[in-house]
A protein has these predicted regions:
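Short loop/turn segments that flank or connect secondary-structure elements
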Residues: 1-203
Length: 203
């Protein structure tokens, strides 16, 4: 039985099918208090209208209209008020879709010292892997993450240095690390470099 401090992350195969959809925060405020820069796109007018312009800065390297919101001296989001998000129903897409379960899924940890709260939350997640399919899918995602880290120099410009982006990329290219046999069995394999490169560029 899982320890009381552990959090159920859900069935692994079910979670994979939900990556990218809105993530309910519940009582978790780890992201809100972990020195995060939050990207907000020009197609989020509802969110932008609720954040004071003085808190927004031009997003470096992105087209005009993309902005980021920083954090205060405590590392808290400026919209985090009285222990909760003051614009929760109108929060940025980045906040809606950020799912820290991607880290344990890929066997990675966040790469920023100021994110101790997120790291603690990550260590609490426990996925259910009740069927062989769940086990092999999780193994494929972790194999993809390990491969990307080990072969980043062989894939110049394609492997993110940021562990969050790397984890999501590993989820996205997991299929190339799977082989389906005539017997119906699915197993994890190490693909050719060109196959990995092609999988990344198709995204």
């Amino acid at each position: 039985m899982a320890e009381p401090d552990h959090l159920p992350a859900g069935r692994f195969s079910t979670w994979l099918g939900q990556v990218g959809v809105d993530v309910p925060c519940g009582t978790c405020t780890a992201c809100c208090t972990s020195s995060q820069f939050v990207h907000i796109g020009p197609d989020e007018p509802d969110t932008l209208s609720r954040i004071p312009k003085a808190l927004l800065f031009v997003a470096p390297g992105l087209p005009r209209g993309h902005v980021v919101m920083g954090y205060d001296e405590r590392g808290h989001c400026p919209m985090f008020v009285d222990g909760a998000c003051s614009i929760y129903e109108h929060r940025p897409r980045t906040c809606r879709t950020y799912d820290c379960r991607v880290f344990p899924a890929a066997g990675l940890e966040p790469d920023h010292d100021g994110r101790a709260g997120i790291a603690a939350q990550i260590r609490r997640w426990r996925f259910d892997v009740p069927e062989p399919d769940d086990e092999v899918l999780q193994a494929a995602v972790r194999a993809a993450a390990s491969y990307l880290r080990a072969n980043a120099k062989l894939l110049p410009g394609l492997v993110p240095g940021n562990s969050t982006q790397l984890a999501f990329l590993a989820v996205g290219i997991r299929e190339v690390f799977l082989e389906r046999l005539a017997s119906g069995e699915v197993r994890v394999v190490t693909p050719a470099l060109d196959a990995v490169r092609a999988a990344i560029t198709r995204r």
